[in-house]
Amino acid sequence: QKIGDELADLIVKGIKTATTSALELYEPNEKKPKVGTYNIVLDGSGHPACITQTKVVETINFNQVSAEHAYHEGEGDRSLAYWRAEHLKFFQAAYQAMNQTFHEQIPCICEVFTVVYVSDKK
C-alpha cells in the first residue's frame, strides 16, 4: 500500500512522468501501452488518484534505458544508477515468479505520460 501511495503522489505532483515495464512479462492477449491511451492511476488503497494519457512509447533493452528516462520516472535520486538498481530487483523477482530468467538485454516498454485529471477525493 505504501509504495502505491508514494508512486501515485509522485504522478499527481508531476514528478513521475514515465514508467517502464518488461515486454516479456505481458500475458499473450494483454494490451501493451500505446500513444493516446488514458490510464486511471490508483493509490495504495485502490482509490483513483488521477488519470494520465500516454504520450510516448518505446521498446528499449533494459541496459539501454537512458538517464533521461530514469530521471522522468521520478523515483529516488532520479539517477540512472538508482533506476537500474531498483528495476533490477523488481524485474528479477517478476521474472523468477514467471519461471523465467532476467538478463540485462530484456526488452522494456518505456512510456512517457502526462496527468490530465487529478481526483479531488483524498
Q: For the regions a protein language model found, what residue spans apply to each?
A:
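Loop/turn positions that initiate beta-strands
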Residues: 35-42
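Compositionally biased, charged N-terminal/linker segments
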Residues: 1-26
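Short beta-strand-centered aromatic/proline hotspots
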Residues: 49-58
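Short, surface-exposed secondary-structure edge patches
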Residues: 27-32
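Short polar/acidic secondary-structure junctions
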Residues: 44-46
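Short, solvent-exposed secondary-structure boundary/capping segments
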Residues: 60-71
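Contiguous surface segments at macromolecular interaction interfaces
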Residues: 77-122
